[in-house]
């Protein structure tokens, strides 16, 4: 079969590679450079964590939303001008985390695509010739004290429920692992099975290049819709003309929303904008990835320097970046690691990108309503990078008509059908 994959981020690249491995003729549509700055995969926080099963929306969050609207320094901000359009999504977002039962179901679904993510990335990176980019050195969550950790009891209970294990560190343990960490932090949780990527852009580029070497074709075009012959897919429409095909995969990140509508599924997908800053001299920073509890940010040593990633900004996809969000990350990092250099010249790069996010925190994976010849693979939010390889395998199974490696029922687009919350 001829399969057209729309998008060459980590999810699209993984889908294309699995499909070409299975013997399909594969065309990858990507208007920009695979692994380039336009992709959420490029600027992602680099973590590959089985601990990322905790949804953004949790019980009691609704009480905090008004505060987010007025706190310019907080980890989550909503642009006022976007609020009217965002309101339906925001309502569903709060309802998704309204009860413990709901977040337990979400965590279980996320665990199904995250549990073995470090091993999958190690195998994939080795296959595509850049195994040195994936390191499984553990991921550290740093807290001021044990009570601060215990205040997140539900989050850690969800992680324990999904099979995660960790090791607790006191101040001496923190100092041994991270000598540069401020003495404000006196308690830590080390997820030893966690991994990270030292250069996400190069990694994604290598996956696409490997797929092309195996026979896939990379076309610099953007998918704009579909042509059908009855219930069957006839072609993918692009800004360069139609491409006849038998199957199609929607993996275009935030741009997937319009394609999903064309495939019969009006999915509530919003741009959850994230930022990162890179400090070239991170020698006084973390030796391994660290997430300080008060900053809600990933501090990760990478090939380019110390990457400081985080922030959630809900705004229009076309709104200009607010670089103050990146500056907040730098300011916090300098408090977390007092030895980091000061001054604007210490920051070598700033980036903003769009996490494609659904209100319930789960991706959309599975056949489209208009035609089962189209398979959705988008909306992964914060877990797209970690779950990219397994999503690719699931999609290849669905295209082949085989039983998928994981149950895709929780990820079906139909969960957003009219009348469902």
PLM features: residue spans?
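N-terminal Rossmann-like FAD-binding beta1-loop-alpha1 element of flavoenzymes
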Residues: 2-28
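Active-site substrate-recognition segment that forms the wall
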Residues: 44-47, 52-96, 225-233, 241-372
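Rossmann-like flavin
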Residues: 87-209
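C-terminal catalytic lobe of FAD-dependent flavoproteins
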Residues: 166, 294, 335-421
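A conserved short coil-to-beta-strand element within the FAD-binding core of flavoproteins
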Residues: 169-178, 219-234
